[in-house]
Amino acid sequence: XXIENEXEIVDMHNALRRAVRPTASNMLQM
């Protein structure tokens, strides 16, 4: 359980990173 929860947290961080990367590249282009 605990391990599964950690995996879910990692997925959340990965999803957030993927969502942030395009915005960061856009900021650099600006």
Swiss-Prot record:
This chain belongs to the protein called: Cysteine-rich venom protein ascarin
Q: Which InterPro entries match?
A: CAP_sf (IPR035940)
* Tissue occurrence: Expressed by the venom gland.
Q: Which domain of life is it from?
A: Eukaryota
* CC annotations in GO: extracellular region
Q: Which family does it belong to?
A: Belongs to the CRISP family.
List GO molecular-function terms, semicolon-separated.
calcium channel regulator activity; toxin activity
Post-translational modifications reported in the UniProt record: Contains 8 disulfide bonds.
Q: Where in the cell is it found?
A: Secreted
In which organism is this protein found?
A: Aspidelaps scutatus
- Where is this protein chiefly located? secreted
Q: Does the keyword Cell inner membrane apply?
A: no
Sorted UniProt keywords: Calcium channel impairing toxin, Disulfide bond, Ion channel impairing toxin, Neurotoxin, Secreted, Toxin
The protein's matches in SUPFAM superfamilies, at most eight in alphabetical order, are given as: PR-1-like
What does this protein's UniProt record list under function? Blocks contraction of smooth muscle elicited by high potassium-induced depolarization, but does not block caffeine-stimulated contraction. May target voltage-gated calcium channels on smooth muscle.
